[in-house]
């Protein structure tokens, strides 16, 4: 059995947003999930998040905003060059300049917009719009 914590987080956020919840608890907490939530917060897809400390790694309490139309995980985790990001942008996002693709780069986890500004590529993780 393969377990994908990122997929669990994205699906939990998507499902909670669709039924109109304002807050959701996500666990277990990890540094990668925290950085992905930070990118989503920077682009106002979530209002805020905080870590709830527990003995088994902790959880995140995420306050949702009403701006998420859809989100999902990109599998397989494709490596892309900076020049090819636009191709995946048109594949996963409904329109240009609408939504973000989250990727991991040598400079950390960021949106495709930041990666293009820095001129770097990376591995695609998820999309949100």
From Swiss-Prot:
For molecular function, the Gene Ontology terms on record are: rRNA binding; structural constituent of ribosome
Q: Which domain of life is it from?
A: Archaea
**GO cellular component terms given for this protein:** ribonucleoprotein complex; ribosome
- Example GO biological process term? translation
Alphabetical UniProt keywords: Ribonucleoprotein, Ribosomal protein, RNA-binding, rRNA-binding
Q: Which Pfam families match?
A: Ribosomal_S8
InterPro entries according to UniProt = Ribosomal_uS8, Ribosomal_uS8_CS, Ribosomal_uS8_sf
| Assembly with partners or alone | Part of the 30S ribosomal subunit.
NCBIfam families in alphabetical order: PRK04034.1 (NF003115)
PANTHER family assigned to the protein according to its UniProt record, in alphabetical order: 40S RIBOSOMAL PROTEIN S15A
Record function comment: One of the primary rRNA binding proteins, it binds directly to 16S rRNA central domain where it helps coordinate assembly of the platform of the 30S subunit.
Give the UniProt family note: Belongs to the universal ribosomal protein uS8 family.
Q: What is this protein called?
A: Small ribosomal subunit protein uS8
